[in-house]
Amino acid sequence: MAKKFNYKLPSMVALTLVGSAVTAHQVQAAETTQDQTTNKNVLDSNKVKATTEQAKAEVKNPTQNISGTQVYQDPAIVQPKTANNKTGNAQVSQKVDTAQVNGDTRANQSATTNNTQPVAKSTSTTAPKTNTNVTNAGYSLVDDEDDNSEHQINPELIKSAAKPAALETQYKAAAPKAKTEATPKVTTFSASAQPRSVAATPKTSLPKYKPQVNSSINDYIRKNNLKAPKIEEDYTSYFPKYAYRNGVGRPEGIVVHDTANDRSTINGEISYMKNNYQNAFVHAFVDGDRIIETAPTDYLSWGVGAVGNPRFINVEIVHTHDYASFARSMNNYADYAATQLQYYGLKPDSAEYDGNGTVWTHYAVSKYLGGTDHADPHGYLRSHNYSYDQLYDLINEKYLIKMGKVAPWGTQFTTTPTTPSKPTTPSKPSTGKLTVAANNGVAQIKPTNSGLYTTVYDKTGKATNEVQKTFAVSKTATLGNQKFYLVQDYNSGNKFGWVKEGDVVYNTAKSPVNVNQSYSIKSGTKLYTVPWGTSKQVAGSVSGSGNQTFKASKQQQIDKSIYLYGSVNGKSGWVSKAYLVDTAKPTPTPIPKPSTPTTNNKLTVSSLNGVAQINAKNNGLFTTVYDKTGKPTKEVQKTFAVTKEASLGGNKFYLVKDYNSPTLIGWVKQGDVIYNNAKSPVNVMQTYTVKPGTKLYSVPWGTYKQEAGAVSGTGNQTFKATKQQQIDKSIYLFGTVNGKSGWVSKAYLAVPAAPKKAVAQPKTAVKAYTVTKPQTTQTVSKIAQVKPNNTGIRASVYEKTAKNGAKYADRTFYVTKERAHGNETYVLLNNTSHNIPLGWFNVKDLNVQNLGKEVKTTQKYTVNKSNNGLSMVPWGTKNQVILTGNNIAQGTFNATKQVSVGKDVYLYGTINNRTGWVNAKDLTAPTAVKPTTSAAKDYNYTYVIKNGNGYYYVTPNSDTAKYSLKAFNEQPFAVVKEQVINGQTWYYGKLSNGKLAWIKSTDLAKELIKYNQTGMTLNQVAQIQAGLQYKPQVQRVPGKWTDANFNDVKHAMDTKRLAQDPALKYQFLRLDQPQNISIDKINQFLKGKGVLENQGAAFNKAAQMYGINEVYLISHALLETGNGTSQLAKGADVVNNKVVTNSNTKYHNVFGIAAYDNDPLREGIKYAKQAGWDTVSKAIVGGAKFIGNSYVKAGQNTLYKMRWNPAHPGTHQYATDVDWANINAKIIKGYYDKIGEVGKYFDIPQYK
């Protein structure tokens, strides 16, 4: 859905909820747990329930598939004319702290030239600069995440002093309570409008904003004219959608949160939230570089307790650690908050001191509304010498700038206005006040019309061919005496623009509702792609003779007429209820013909200062951006300088050059490189130490192809640095060591330090744990064993009665929070992964010790004969033993980290292919052995990352430059090199974000198998299939089909049997993930395969475009077309309802779509003609879209699911042949064998 920076609306066509049923919402483990089962106003609840687990498994990288970010265009802001007055700059002239300013503008905008069209305004309150760069999201490294329990109320933490009088007076006066009338944002057709470059500082008659509080950080923000980035959308399909208490799209304000986790990143927070959304989820996260919206703000989230959830938008501030990053994060939050307030017709009004308003902190909700006991974000803001009052002042200023009430930063303002001889020109058009409201209707554009309007302020509309078609209407706008409708595609939500009221035939519409009803319908009746469709929107006609069965699944009322959506004889569409009479029966849905995307052939070029590495798979080098094809290049996986970027149509290019010389390499497509921002190099004079063996590179951020040498000698060597450059967030230095010169990451340079022994006992004993009485929730690092006899576990310290805690007894858990309540002290226990809170225990029920900080180590030990075994957790009990002492005695233990527990030290590592903790007292360090390292050798294979708790490394066996694999867990890793160091095999390859790294072989797997319970027995599902009206088919005699019996079906559906067969197992291969095979290899597969020969590019495009495994597409096409030789694949035409094979224009169908058994050639060609598949490549790409939308992306993402649909047996099944999945599985397995690969992801249903 296009977001608020284009057309924001309350989820058009998706369902306006009737009433405001009281719902309860899940909250943190530290708060009272609510029951969700009574919620009745959830959208598509049955669909969400069915697809949640599948979607959840696929969403691991939080921003991997962002469908574009949008730029907001505000029609209400018009450049005013001003008199020739004395002017000043609108930046607030107050003292600013002398902090270092980050040179990156971190904006996602590029300049365009000679822009005479209405200009889109950025979400930032300042004019955008040209040549700005974006931090590469692929290098956002995810660290371990903390639990979601936030700060809780400390009565001493937040003083209840009255708000300063001036602050209170102005804010309340300037921001009365929101009314229903608003001035929301009205926007462009494009999902990414381009801001124009600013040649000169404009003048304005608007006054300068007068800050109400002193704030050096806010002054820094104003002085440096900080811009907010574009909002990224990272929505998750399985999050529930509930209306606010006043309805969809009607929040009452916004709540400020912080994540309460100093170690996490924005990606880590989002990933954790997606995996634990049942406890809490919020609308957005903000840090110093990005704003990521994770849930539609038209619907509530679970972030502030059961009282506040139905009222407010919840936004989390991710912790940053330096002055500039914190300032950017405050600027980003204020801009996002002001945008939300403006959009929803709300005005800034602080609720902090009276419990009434539109801007809240979590603390204020706890204090005035209840349902939660958190106190954020005050503690975090105070740690940066900032306050909520300063943030609110910035939000208010941003809002007033957006509303055109005060001068934007960077503009000039009138200080001494001259007396005008005639009235000054108003800053708003004279056409009158703008009001915008949500709408839920439909409209047809008349043949004679004024065109489509980008904004309602446009003087003329653009001509359109979209006439006499039914569109959804999502908003109405009134400007002066003129009324407009915002129209969009009914099925996709794509916006067309604003149309005048007089240019359309409009009807009211109720929200669609799900139904399950069968009707009879006369043959020849037309079906439409939309309700109240026109002759231009016919989806097909009912085939057959006499009455046919129409299975309805959806109903919508348009004006006073009822329309139903359903299927009949393989065709789906909408039909008026007037043409239907009650009865029953269903079938699959073809999709409408894809619309032709618009293109923009305007060229924009701007200077750039970055670096890039060309991917191994690329489209080549382009001499000019107008070239249709690029020239092959061997300059891959090397770092080059980037001097320019260009946009032409839908393509973006970088101009790359040799880093050390002026030699230009050529233009490359954006998708063919890994790009990073780069600051200009600066001269330095600094001496460091560097370890021998450290690689030097000829360029900063160099690859293995650009090694300049390695540091020689033994022990630390002296590195004299003469130059420094920042690449993305990393610092690289150029210098000389032992006669060799080159670049090296600063991470490898340090001041000499004495080494520490891995198992050394702490010299100073850790203080024994003593019970304290904190006045609020404190963050602690402790570890506890639950006593066998305990009083139980609580979801909140306020619960009077605890739940039975027997299952936690005699086990060890991490302690992350501590809180006093009355005369008792409670601690929050977390599971062994540190991430998920379990609940609160009274400290009297625990044995507690202090837990030190984990320290990385790399050492091998021998396990003593007498030992306590390998445990799941340090200081684990007998109930948490992974391997007993006898199983690991005198074995080799490979330690990777250590931690102190009280006076003891525990080490974490691997033994007998299992990982866990061992007490240091149970280990003996072996005598030193000279390390062995083999030379890296070429090795090409794609693995799956299986250990999200593992790491990837810049260099193998490094203790410093390593980063968490959590964000890449269960994703492919394309290996190009292999190296063995000290018996450990390492692989060098490419992560899913394009970054090259080293990973241990123990963190990788050749395949990933998941098992899912169906909840039914094999006999039950086989009985359903065998009892269908249209029986499953089997060939007992070649060429002769007969009905399959119960035993045939049961045998074919037995997943235990199939999973044991190395070929038949491939019917469980997940088909919703491409294999990323090169076009050349695909073409080798297709040699001699009829019309499919040399169609590798089409299969590759189809796989990437629709997220489908290309090996499956190929095998499916070969099976359906007889290796590309069938007439259906070779093509024909249907003229006067007869097949013509010698026509000039032929239509092709390579997947047998709609080729029904009674007349497969005619029906298949008719469908291909309707879809416009007049080439084989179009048939491949278009057919893949049908396969993806109707099966693979509908939850049936394996051959087994497509054939048997175990989630809903007997419905929506692709074939009738009981061997269909077996045949395709064998073919797919054969192709994998030919390329020396194996399937990566398997999903196997299990029956009771």
From Swiss-Prot:
GO MF annotation terms: amidase activity; mannosyl-glycoprotein endo-beta-N-acetylglucosaminidase activity; N-acetylmuramoyl-L-alanine amidase activity
Disordered: annotated span: 103-134
Its post-translational modification remark reads: Undergoes proteolytic processing to generate the two extracellular lytic enzymes, probably at the septal region on the cell surface.
Ranges for domain GW: 435-509, 511-585, 604-678, 680-754, 776-851, 853-928, 935-1009
- Keyword Cell wall biogenesis/degradation appears in the UniProt entry: yes
Output the GO biological process annotations, alphabetical, semicolon-separated.
Answer: cell wall organization; peptidoglycan catabolic process
Q: What class of enzyme is it?
A: hydrolase
- Report the subcellular localization: Secreted
| Keyword set, alphabetical order | Cell wall biogenesis/degradation, Hydrolase, Multifunctional enzyme, Repeat, Secreted, Signal
Q: Where is the region N-acetylmuramoyl-L-alanine amidase?
A: 191-767
Chain positions covered by the region annotation Endo-beta-N-acetylglucosaminidase: 768-1248
Q: What does this protein do?
A: Endohydrolysis of the di-N-acetylchitobiosyl unit in high-mannose glycopeptides and glycoproteins containing the -[(Man)5(GlcNAc)2]-Asn structure. One N-acetyl-D-glucosamine residue remains attached to the protein; the rest of the oligosaccharide is released intact. Cleaves the peptidoglycan connecting the daughter cells at the end of the cell division cycle, resulting in the separation of the two newly divided cells. Acts as an autolysin in penicillin-induced lysis.
What does UniProt say about this protein's domains?
Answer: The GW domains are responsible for directing the proteins to the septal region.
Self-association state and partner proteins as the record states: Oligomer; forms a ring structure at the cell surface which is important for efficient partitioning of daughter cells after cell division.
Q: Which family does it belong to?
A: In the N-terminal section; belongs to the N-acetylmuramoyl-L-alanine amidase 2 family. In the C-terminal section; belongs to the glycosyl hydrolase 73 family.
Protein name, UniProt field: Bifunctional autolysin
Instruction: Tell me which species this is from.
Output: Staphylococcus aureus (strain Mu50 / ATCC 700699)
